[in-house]
Amino acid sequence: MALEIVGAGFGRTGTLSMKTALEQLGFGPCHHMVEVFGRPESVDPWAAAIEGRDVDLDALVDGFRAAVDFPVCAAWSRFADHFPEAKVLLTVRSSESWWRSYEATIGPRIAATDHGEGQSMMTAIREVVFGGRPMDRQHAIEVYEAHNADVILRTPSDRILVYELGAGWEPLCTFLGVAVPDEPFPASLTQG
């Protein structure tokens, strides 16, 4: 099964809600950081993907139709290149809103140096994505904004959806060419 959707949006941009939404629309299973916690054998290969080292990208997402959140967003361009038919989904929110949520949830986990089995992947995110400064507010916001701008710049407009947190079903369903469900959009944000 080839990956059909590459999620390029950072964690804390509604990625867990998006995972649920994509699965409801038939694009599941959808990979998310929560899957890594249940697959410790995937940690080192994900670190390799983030660091740009040789790794079997197909194996990392084997069995998944979509992937969102960290770690895939940290290597989004590798996956977009490897799966040229896949659509790119960039989930976003305001930089200040993202920082507040990130700082209160995943930021300290990324900054920590004691991750046990997840160490190599979290180190890769901390060093490669955030340049070793994941809790430096101004730097992290600049990284977030530069990442989003890079995704938009490098992806053809007919291949990307920039999805603003809270936009509901319509833009997503239009982009994917599927009907809008007759139910509320999933709301899975655990912290601001």
Question: Which residue ranges define each predicted feature?
Answer:
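Glycine-rich phosphate-binding loop used to anchor ATP phosphates in small-molecule kinases
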Residues: 60-83, 88-91
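Conserved phosphate-donor/acceptor-positioning beta-strand/loop module used by diverse small-molecule
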Residues: 79-104, 172
